[in-house]
């Protein structure tokens, strides 16, 4: 895990070279998909496009930092099982007991490491397109609600508060 000077974890999920065919030949550009998190519950992702790789990465990282969201975590895992969907991508995320580790692949693993989840079971269903899998993962994570928040919505008191 790469940590920058602000203590943020940056992960490159996908780097793609695309070609535009013009009269003189092919013109290449790059797109980068990056996940940024603080490993304490905040995570964001960004897509950057440019003529050069470093510029695409910079743009993606900037966008990811700008769009960070807070995710409720319970002892290094998720509070409950969740299903995130985006396009054809569907990601199932299950909380796991301590010591399990991150059992996930590709884009899902990058997001989990950036957000600070240490134990989780995940399965990407439907597509293996990194863009859709990443957005499905983020959709699932952003729909998570903490026990405190739900009890406040219902106007009830928690018997045993959870961390």
UniProtKB/Swiss-Prot annotation:
Alphabetized Pfam families for the sequence: Ribosomal_S5, Ribosomal_S5_C
Keyword GTP-binding attached: no
Alphabetized UniProt keyword annotations: Ribonucleoprotein, Ribosomal protein, RNA-binding, rRNA-binding
PROSITE patterns linked to this entry: RIBOSOMAL_S5, S5_DSRBD
One GO biological process term: translation
A single Gene Ontology CC term: small ribosomal subunit
Residue spans crossing the bilayer: none
GO molecular-function terms, A-Z: rRNA binding; structural constituent of ribosome
Superkingdom of the source species: Bacteria
Keyword Cytoplasm in annotation: no
Protein family per UniProt: Belongs to the universal ribosomal protein uS5 family.
Domain comment in the entry: The N-terminal domain interacts with the head of the 30S subunit; the C-terminal domain interacts with the body and contacts protein S4. The interaction surface between S4 and S5 is involved in control of translational fidelity.
Subunit structure: Part of the 30S ribosomal subunit. Contacts proteins S4 and S8.
Free-text function comment from the UniProt entry: With S4 and S12 plays an important role in translational accuracy. Located at the back of the 30S subunit body where it stabilizes the conformation of the head with respect to the body.
Protein's UniProt name: Small ribosomal subunit protein uS5
Native species: Nitratidesulfovibrio vulgaris (strain DSM 19637 / Miyazaki F) (Desulfovibrio vulgaris)
Gene of this entry: rpsE
